[in-house]
A protein has these predicted regions:
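Conserved AMP-binding/adenylation subdomain of ANL enzymes
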Residues: 206-226, 231-271, 282-286
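Conserved pre-ATP/AMP-binding loop-to-beta segment of ANL
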Residues: 10, 26, 144-147, 151-153, ...
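Gly/Ser/Thr-rich phosphate-binding loop
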Residues: 160, 267-275, 284-345, 357
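Conserved AMP-binding A3 loop
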Residues: 38-40, 176, 183-207
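AMP-binding/adenylate-forming catalytic core of the ANL superfamily
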Residues: 95-105, 112-114, 378-381, 385-386, ...
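Conserved AMP-binding/adenylate-forming core of the ANL superfamily
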Residues: 9, 26-71, 75-79, 96-101, ...
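Conserved ATP/PPi-binding loop(s) of AMP-dependent carboxylate-activating enzymes
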Residues: 351-355, 367-397, 435
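Structural core segment of the AMP-binding/adenylate-forming
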Residues: 55-56, 84-159, 291, 473-476
Length: 500
C-alpha cells in the first residue's frame, strides 16, 4: 500500500529514492520481465552497488557512462552513480564507434557500464574497435553487466566489493550531493557536425518531472510502459521521474517491438503510454492489436500532428497529453492537462510547467510577437546551465535575457497555450529523433566519389520526416547500396539517408 499523497520534499535524486523507499517500501517500482523490484528492494540494490563504486575509486564529479538497453541494471547503475555524487553519461545504443569515441573522450569518462550484447550488436567488439581505431586517454574501466570471462571485473561484482565499504562512507558521499550538482549528461544532435553534451542537475530534474506527472494526474497506482530508450531525456529524465515522483511503477521493455509492446501493456495492465508516432503507428497497425486488451491505458504523453496524437488515443490512452520540450529543458516545458477536451489536446501542448517561462520572439526584431502570431520559442527556468565544454555554443544558445533559443517555431494563444509550428533550424526529426544534417554531410563529404552533398528531410508517413541526400558526384555516381553501406560504418542507422 502507498501512502504518497504530496509532492516529495527531496531536492536530490539519492534523497528522493530514500524518501520514497521510506514512505512506500513495498510498492512496486521497476518491472523487468519476471522480476519486480519494490522501492525498498531497489534502494537496497542501489546502495550496495554505490558502495561498490566507491570501492573501485569512483568519486564526486567523476563521469560514468551507461551503454545498454532498457533493463533493471540500467536504472540500478543510474541511481548508484548519482548516489556517490558522480555524473551519469547515458550513451546511445545505436551510436557508431566514431560517435562513442567522441562522447567518451569529450565527457572524460572514467568508467563505462555496459551489456556485452544488445540486440544484434556485440558491444565488446564495438568498444574494442573504439580503443583500437580512436584511442581513449585515459582508458576507462570497463564493467560489463553480464558475466564475461575476458573481464577482470563486472558490474555484478560491485555489491561484493561494496560489502567492505562502511555505510558511513556512503552517507558522507551522499550528503555532499547538492541540488545544483549535475545528475546526468545527455548527448543530443546539434546544428553543427558534433553532438552537444547537455548537463542536467538534480533539483530541476525532480521538480520539472513532478509537474509533468501532475498534468497527467499520475498516482501510485499507475504503471508506465517504457520502451522509449532510457538514454533519451524522454526516458531517463521525463518518464522515469514523472512516474517516480508520484510513486508508481515503471514497466521496462528492453527495446521497442510493437507486438511485444502490446503484450506487455496487456499483461502488466499498464496505465501510462509514453511513445512517439513512430511507435504508436506500428502498434496500432500490428495484427495482434485487435486481440489485445489495452483497456488499462489511460494517460501518457506523445508528440506530433493531430493525426499522430490521435493514434495514442486510438490505442486506448484517452487522456493522452500533447507535449513540447527538448533535452536542454529536462524533456518537457509544456504539457497540456490530461483532463482538457480532446480537441484541444490534439493541437496544443498547453501552458508551461511550473518553474518555466516562455516567450515567442520575432527573430528579426528580438521582440515578443502578439498572441496567435508565429515566432521562435524561447524558454527560461528549468534549463541546462550550459553545454559541456562548449562556451561558444553557450553564447549562441542563450539570448541577452537568459532565454534558450530553441530554434523551434510556435504560437501562444490568449490563454498561454503553446502550439508547435515547425523548426527554425535545419534539424530533421525522423521517427521522433532529432538529427543534424551537418553531421551527416560532414561524414559523406569524405566519400571519394562525392563532390558536394546536401541533406534534408522529406515528408514520410511512418517517420514524419525521412532523411534525403542530394549528391553531386565527382564522376560515376555511387549506388544507393554503396552509400548506405558507407554511412552505416560511421553513423547510427537512423542517421543514414533513406533517399538519394
Amino acid at each position: 500500500m502507498s501512502f504518497l499523497m504530496n509532492k516529495p520534499t527531496s531536492r536530490t535524486v539519492p534523497n528522493l529514492l530514500d524518501e520514497l523507499a521510506y514512505v512506500q517500501p513495498e510498492q512496486p517500482f521497476v518491472v523487468d520481465g519476471e522480476n519486480c523490484l519494490t522501492y525498498g528492494d531497489f534502494r537496497n540494490l542501489v546502495r550496495t552497488h554505490a558502495k561498490g563504486l566507491l570501492s573501485i575509486g569512483v568519486k564526486r564529479g567523476d563521469r560514468i557512462a551507461i551503454l545498454m538497453g532498457n533493463r533493471a541494471e540500467w536504472l540500478i547503475a543510474y541511481f548508484a552513480i548519482m548516489n556517490v555524487g558522480a555524473e551519469v553519461v547515458a550513451l546511445n545504443t545505436m551510436a557508431s564507434p566514431r560517435e562513442l569515441a567522441y562522447q567518451l573522450t569529450h565527457a572524460e569518462i572514467t568508467v563505462i557500464i555496459f551489456e556485452p550484447w544488445f540486440r544484434d550488436r556485440d558491444f565488446l567488439e564495438v568498444l574494442g574497435e573504439v580503443k583500437r581505431e580512436y584511442g581513449l586517454d585515459p582508458l576507462p574501466t570497463f564493467l560489463p553487466v553480464d558475466t564475461d570471462p575476458a573481464s577482470a571485473l563486472t558490474f555484478g561484482q560491485l555489491p561484493e566489493l561494496g560489502a567492505l565499504v562502511k555505510e558511513d562512507a556512503l552517507a558522507v558521499a551522499q550528503a555532499k550531493v547538492s541540488s545544483e550538482d549535475t545528475a546526468c549528461i545527455l548527448y543530443t544532435s546539434g546544428s553543427t557536425a558534433l553532438p552537444k553534451g547537455v548537463p542536467l542537475h538534480h533539483w530541476a530534474m525532480i521538480d520539472n518531472a513532478w509537474s509533468i506527472g501532475e498534468r497527467q494526474h499520475l498516482t501510485p497506482d499507475d504503471r508506465l510502459w517504457l520502451a522509449v530508450a532510457l538514454f533519451w531525456s524522454y526516458g531517463c529524465v521525463n518518464a522515469l521521474f514523472a512516474l517516480m515522483t508520484h510513486g508508481g511503477a515503471i514497466v521496462l521493455q528492453h527495446h521497442f517491438e510493437p507486438g511485444e509492446a502490446l503484450r506487455l501493456i496487456e499483461c502488466e495492465r499498464c496505465t501510462v503510454f509514453y511513445g512517439t508516432a513512430a511507435m504508436s503507428r506500428p502498434m496500432y497497425e500490428h495484427p495482434d492489436r485487435p486481440n489485445r486488451d489495452l483497456s488499462s491505458l489511460r494517460t501518457g504523453t506523445t508528440i506530433g500532428t493531430p493525426e499522430q496524437v490521435q493514434l495514442a488515443v486510438d490505442l486506448g490512452a484517452s487522456e493522452i497529453c500533447n507535449v513540447y520540450g527538448l533535452t536542454e529543458a529536462f524533456g518537457n516545458s509544456c504539457v497540456i492537462d490530461a483532463k482538457m477536451p480532446l480537441e484541444r489536446r490534439l493541437v496544443s501542448s498547453g501552458p508551461v510547467l511550473d518553474g518555466v517561462k516562455i516567450r515567442i520572439i520575432d527573430v528579426d526584431t528580438e521582440e515578443n510577437v502578439a498572441a496567435g502570431e508565429m515566432g521562435e520559442i524561447r524558454l527560461h527556468g528549468h534549463l541546462t546551465n550550459g553545454y559541456l565544454n562548449d562556451q561558444e555554443r553557450n553564447a549562441e544558445a542563450f539570448d541577452s535575457l537568459g532565454y534558450l533559443r530553441t530554434g523551434d517555431l510556435g504560437t501562444l494563444d490568449e490563454e498561454g497555450f503553446l502550439t508547435y509550428r515547425g523548426r527554425l533550424k535545419e534539424m530533421v526529426k525522423t521517427g521522433g529523433i532529432n538529427v543534424a544534417p551537418a553531421e551527416i554531410e560532414a561524414v559523406y563529404s569524405r566519400h571519394e566519389a562525392i563532390a558536394e552533398i546536401y541533406v534534408t528531410g522529406i515528408p514520410d508517413d511512418r517517420l514524419d520526416e525521412a532523411l534525403a541526400a542530394v549528391i553531386v558526384s565527382k564522376g560515376e555516381p555511387p549506388t544507393k547500396t554503396a552509400l548506405v553501406e558507407f554511412g552505416r560504418k560511421v553513423l547510427a542507422g537512423y542517421k543514414v539517408p533513406r533517399h538519394y
